[in-house]
């Protein structure tokens, strides 16, 4: 059942249920980190999140810092890699001292704090209605592992953004923008 009001706080029933398929990254994978998880979301859920994603896409390129290349239409992470290489090369030839920091955000989608994300969205000026719909979509998802074609029991997830969900990468970009702003501030 999908809620019909603008104050929707929870998407109920099977709409917020997801099957999580684990695909081995290489042959003979036994450790959980050697699997890629794919979220097989309900079609109604995907439609709702696609509508929200389309709204987010219209404004993210304006509010997300230009140096943040990932997940924003028209930007590429490769551009940032080339920019860093050029900066290092230039500093080396001018004999300037500096520091380079590489951050590895492994499994970053699994470590999103929802309360922080919603706070950032409020600071950016997103409408309460949009934030409420995002909350309804990512709050209390029910997940069942799909192992060798068999479903395991459903459990409730708490802090992840679903990979394969139309707006997960955009929500992650919103949260990650805080780091970009902080790096710019202390530059």
What residue spans do the PLM features occupy?
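Nucleotidyl polymerases of mobile genetic elements and RNA viruses
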Residues: 1-187
